UniProtKB/Swiss-Prot annotation:
Name under which the protein is recorded: Mast cell carboxypeptidase A
Organism: Homo sapiens
EC number of the protein: 3.4.17.1
InterPro entries the UniProt entry points to: CPB_M14_CPD, M14A-like_propep, M14A_act_pep, Peptidase_M14
Pfam families according to UniProt: Peptidase_M14, Propep_M14
Molecular functions per Gene Ontology: metallocarboxypeptidase activity; zinc ion binding
Length: 417
């Protein structure tokens, strides 16, 4: 018997169907001069290119490695245009949907147990925060700092002395929804900090003398959307006035030279800055929390992916901050320490000259607020998998990054008052 569905139900079902990326490709192109850079920009005007690196069309420049996603329908035309203009390129990913499915390459060892070797959805992360509080009641507390536009809670885990105000490090993960290895690291950090306290000399010393504030998922609505509807989603899920396009790039929404970089005012662009500084509920919740704990917080660290970099201010100007030498020293040693585990090589430097100019970033905002040690990690890899780092790479990524974070914490403990 044929089942006839009401038209409205069919429409709703189609509307919420997850986006598929069958036979979509990711190209890597290195324009040799400004003319070739302009060719890429022109292609972006007539084709729907999703820029993975750099984060937007206007950042494309000569001698920069440029990664972008192309639909199956447009990939042949793009390839032909690159060939005609004698541009060097490689195809990093031949079938994006296939890579998305291959990303889950670790089997769940014990069903129901929180896995640090797998990517976890928001529901599992919330349950995990409760579990960590129950398991370590003297060391872990959960603070609701606000809620999202879709009314999901924003939780910060405080690791350390529950009732004492001491030096602290604030860390956030998952400000961009599709960068899944970032929230995986925040979970790993909490797990290792609590598990090794009393056993690992360095971690014990750190937790005896300082607190850590961990925001495991900054962009909760976007993260949920990337799990359920569109794996490539980047922004949050707020509605934009006078536009059908959804979302703001939360890392362009901070009050740090907010409107100084052009081409961030299009609500349909992935790097849309929002209608005003701190216009987004997530941004406001984080800035309010950090302001209220400013006397404690000595370090701000934010985790992104991908490209293997350790960045520090500024993004909105080529001017170097007053303590540039100190920041560069910490970043250099941090990347050296990170490489001792698996010989993974990171580069380091100011955002503006190391990656590309950006305005409205959380890193610059925290620095200008008075937190003089602010860093952004761009985690693995360098582009082979991009945002689709396989689960089998989560633990190695977290282990090596943990070494760098512990070094930064030790340095701050010793060198700040």
């Amino acid at each position: 018997m044929r089942l006839i569905l009401p038209v409205g139900l069919i429409a709703t079902t189609l509307a919420i169907a997850p986006v598929r990326f069958d036979r979509e490709k990711v190209f890597r192109v290195k324009p040799q001069d400004e003319k070739q850079a302009d060719i890429i920009k022109d292609l972006a005007k007539t084709n729907e290119l999703d820029f993975w690196y750099p984060g937007a069309t206007h950042h494309v420049a000569a001698n920069m490695m440029v990664d972008f996603r192309v639909s199956e329908k447009e990939s042949q035309a793009i390839q032909s245009a690159l060939d005609q203009n004698k541009m060097h390129y490689e195809i990093l990913i031949h079938d994006l949907q296939e890579e998305i499915e291959k990303q889950f390459d670790v089997k769940e060892d014990i069903p129901g147990r929180h896995s640090y070797a797998k990517y976890n959805n928001w529901e599992k992360i919330v349950a995990w925060t409760e579990k960590m509080m129950d398991k370590y009641p003297e060391m872990v507390s959960r603070i609701k700092i606000g809620s999202t536009v879709e009314d999901n809670p924003l939780y910060v885990l405080k690791i350390g002395e529950k009732n004492e105000r001491r030096k602290a490090i604030f860390t956030d993960c998952g400000i961009h929804a599709r960068e899944w290895v970032s929230p995986a690291f925040c979970q790993w950090f909490v797990y290792q900090a609590t598990k090794t306290y009393g056993r690992n000399k360095i971690m014990t010393k750190l937790l005896d003398r300082m607190n850590f504030y961990i925001l495991p998922v900054f962009n909760v609505d976007g993260y949920i959307w990337s799990w359920t509807k569109n794996r490539m989603w980047r922004k949050n899920r707020s509605k934009n006035q006078n536009s059908k396009c959804i979302g703001t790039d939360l890392n362009r929404n901070f009050n740090a030279s907010w409107n100084s970089i052009p081409n961030t005012n299009d609500p349909c662009a992935d790097n849309y800055r929002g209608s005003a500084p701190e216009s987004e509920k997530e941004t406001k919740a984080v800035t309010n929390f950090i302001r209220s704990h400013l006397n404690e917080i000595k370090v701000y660290i934010t985790f992104h992916s991908y490209s293997q970099m350790l960045l520090f201010p500024y993004g909105y100007t080529s001017k170097l901050p007053p303590n540039h030498e100190d920041l560069a020293k910490v970043a250099k040693i941090g990347t050296d320490v990170l490489s001792t585990r698996y010989e993974t090589r990171y580069i380091y430097g100011p955002i503006e000259s190391t990656i590309y100019p950006i305005s409205g970033s959380s890193l610059d905002w925290a620095y200008d607020l008075g937190i003089k040690h602010t860093f952004a990690f761009e985690l693995r890899d360098k582009g082979k998998f991009g945002f689709l780092l396989p689960e089998s790479r989560i633990k190695p990524t977290c282990r090596e990054t943990m070494l760098a974070v512990k070094f930064i914490a030790k340095y701050i403990l010793k060198h700040t008052s």
